[in-house]
Structures are given as C-alpha cells and as structure tokens.
C-alpha cells in the first residue's frame, strides 16, 4: 500500500481550501497595478516633503545683520569735529586734502583748521596760495579757521621741510565747545569714514599703538588722536610743552619718535583707550617689510597687502628716510626704498611684487588727489 505524498501547503485547520486553490488567483489588470504604485510613490513624496518642512521651520534662525546702535540722522554733529593744523603751504594743502576726503566719504562732523595768525584770507594775486587754500577750506569744506600764535609753530619748518615738528595738534585739546575732536595727521590718506570714533566709550584720549615698535615698547602713536577736549588737559599739556616752545629741548626730526608723541605718552600711556592699529594706525612702511609679526601680533597670519589695505581706515606715509609724497625724491634713494618682490627681486624674473604695486599706488593716489589744491609747486629738497 503506497503512502500518500504530503502536500507542500497542507490544509488549514477548519479550511476547505487546497494548494491548488491558493494559487488560483485571478489576474490583476496592469492599470490597477500602476495606480497602486503611483499611490505609494505619492504617499512617500508627501511624507518626505512633510519631514523637510518640519526641519526647515525648526532650523536655527540666521543672525540679524549688524545694526549700528547710533542713528546718525539724530546726532547733533555740531558737537563733534575733525581738526587739522598747517605750519606751511605744503601742510595747508595736506589739510585741505583731508577735508576733501572727509567730505567725499560723507562725514557730517565739523572741521577745524589751525593756521598761523600772520596768514589771511585776502587773495592778493594768483601766486597767493596760502590765502587761496584758506578760502577753499572755509568756503568749500566749511572749515572753522582758528589763527594761532607763531610760538606754537616755531618748532615746525617751512614749505620745503618734509617732516613737520610742531606741537600745534595739542591745540585740539582746548576746543571745549566740542564733546569730541578727532585729530588726524595731515600726511595720510583717509580711506574710509571714521565717524564711529566719536562714539567710543568715555576716555580722555584714544590712540593706536606705534605697532612697529612692538613688542619692545608700547608707545602710543599720535598720527590719530580721539580727544575729549578739556581746559585742564589742555593747560597741563601746554605746560609740559613749554621747554620745546622756548627752545630748551631739541625736537627730533625722526618720524619714529616725535616730541608730541613723547608729551602724549608721558601723560596718557597708562590711561588712553587703545585703538586697533590695523584700522587706525597702518603706515606705508609696512608694505616694505617681509616680517609682519609686529603688525599682526602673532606669527601665524598670512600677509595679504590687498586685504590689509581694505581693512584700513587710513594710511600714514612713513618711509624714512624717503621724504613725504609731496616732495620729489632722489631716484637712487627711491630705488633703495621700493618694496622688494618676493621671488628673485632685482632680476628680470622677479615675481610676487604686489607689495610694491600697493605701495606705489598709495603715493600715486596722494599726488593725484593733491590737484584739489590750487597749483602748489612741487617741492625739491636735498633728496631731489
């Protein structure tokens, strides 16, 4: 008697269905299958979009754009001023150039110009350059003209001197009708507005460091001074300056350490608010260096002359012994002073000369902008 072969799918309990019945499934139309697949795809798409929307709305909100806490339209600008002084025709033109830059950059603060009391605003003829420049400063650039006594500028030189050595900038401390005065050396190129300095935290003075002397000394540089005018401070500084005014001390002609810097450091070295020199104290001599650790304050940043210039608010012309840019220099000296290229300098294959290009552009720009002044003759000195 043979055994009956067991089926692969035995009968279910309480079920009359057989294996043949299980596979007896009617054919489903292709259209119905396609519709079912589309519904599944649509469901997954909807689910994915839903998840994306949840993640989108839960994302971290972007930081708001920085907004100045000062509404410049509501500022009483008559309480703030920039100051300049002139000890010669050359420096008078420089001062006018600074006023032109401030005007062009949209500064709304007052402008004050100290000048020798023996000058006047009467233009006698076409050769009376000083009077023409004073009128230009007053009428076009709305400068307040303040005559000063000869003793305040006798430490300075004439038009042919490249380096001004007077202490007339200290007069800005006596302008007590203003809440704050910003004094800028006139041998600069102003690149960006600096009106934000009027709203620094309270401090008698704010100055950048003479960073080129770091880390050996932490001398403050007088190329830019933010001042809270005070009769007490003015009187104290004038008393300190008496030896220089009366010829009892020799005023140094070297740009690296001037007498006004010495006076200001003696009084404010430990109390001044220090301004970042990258923005407010850059000097042209930095583009001639290969070691920029004093400028950066570290040894890991990479020097990029274009980036450095873009961050600067002003640049001070300081390339001793090269004279200032309004003085024609000897070509031999100029060749020695020019920034060196990074690769094979002095050869036909030299490359990496961007420092030189930026440095030359600063001097060329200064001379080009000097056309704002009535025809000032080019000065020749022992250098040219």
Curated annotation (Swiss-Prot):
Keywords: Glycoprotein, Golgi apparatus, Membrane, Signal-anchor, Transferase, Transmembrane, Transmembrane helix, Vacuole. A motif (DXD) lies at residues 185-187. It is an enzyme of class 2 (transferase). CDD domains: GT8_GNT1. InterPro entries: GNT1/Glycosyltrans_8, Nucleotide-diphossugar_trans. Glycans are attached at residue 254. It comes from the Eukaryota. It is a single-pass type II membrane protein. GO terms for molecular function: glycosyltransferase activity. Residues 1-39 are cytoplasmic. Residues 58-384 are lumenal. It is found in: Golgi apparatus membrane; Vacuole membrane. Its EC number is 2.4.1.-. The chain crosses the membrane at residues 40-57. GO terms for cellular component: Golgi membrane; vacuolar membrane. Its main location: Golgi. N-acetylglucosaminyltransferase involved in the Golgi-specific modification of N-linked glycans. Belongs to the GNT1 family. This is Glucose N-acetyltransferase 1.
């Amino acid at each position: 008697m043979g055994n009956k072969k067991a089926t692969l799918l035995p009968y279910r309990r309480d079920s009359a269905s057989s294996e043949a019945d299980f596979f007896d499934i009617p054919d489903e139309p292709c259209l119905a299958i396609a519709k079912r697949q589309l519904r599944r795809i649509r469901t997954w798409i909807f689910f994915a979009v839903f998840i994306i929307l949840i993640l989108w709305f839960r994302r971290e909100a972007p930081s708001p754009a920085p907004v100045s806490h000062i509404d410049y339209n509501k500022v009483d600008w008559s309480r703030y001023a920039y100051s300049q002084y002139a000890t010669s025709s050359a420096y008078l033109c420089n001062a006018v150039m600074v006023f032109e830059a401030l005007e062009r950059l949209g500064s709304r603060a007052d402008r004050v110009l100290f000048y020798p009391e023996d000058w006047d605003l009467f233009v006698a003829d076409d050769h009376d350059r000083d009077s023409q420049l004073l009128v230009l400063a007053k009428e076009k650039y709305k400068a307040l003209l303040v005559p000063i006594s000869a003793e305040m500028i006798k430490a300075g030189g004439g038009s042919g001197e490249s380096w001004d050595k007077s202490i007339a900038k200290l007069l800005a401390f006596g302008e007590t009708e203003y809440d704050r005065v910003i004094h800028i050396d006139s041998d600069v190129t102003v690149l960006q507005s600096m009106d934000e300095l009027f709203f620094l935290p309270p401090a008698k003075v704010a100055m950048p460091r003479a960073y080129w002397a770091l880390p050996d000394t932490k001398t403050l540089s007088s190329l830019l001074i933010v001042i809270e005018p005070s009769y007490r401070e003015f009187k104290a500084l004038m008393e300190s300056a008496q030896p220089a005014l009366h010829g009892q001390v020799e005023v140094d002609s070297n740009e690296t350490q001037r007498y006004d810097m010495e006076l200001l450091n003696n009084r404010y070295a430990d109390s001044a608010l220090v301004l970042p020199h990258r923005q407010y104290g850059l000097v042209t001599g930095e583009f001639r260096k290969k070691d920029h650790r004093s400028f950066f304050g570290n040894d890991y940043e990479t020097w990029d002359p274009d980036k450095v210039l873009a961050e600067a608010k002003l640049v001070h012309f300081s390339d001793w012994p090269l004279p200032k840019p309004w003085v024609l220099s000897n070509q031999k000296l100029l060749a020695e002073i020019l920034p060196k290229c990074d690769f094979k300098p002095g050869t036909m294959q030299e490359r990496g000369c961007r420092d030189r290009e930026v440095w030359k552009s600063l001097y060329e720009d200064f001379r080009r902008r000097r056309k704002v002044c009535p025809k000032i003759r080019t000065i020749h000195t022992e250098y040219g």
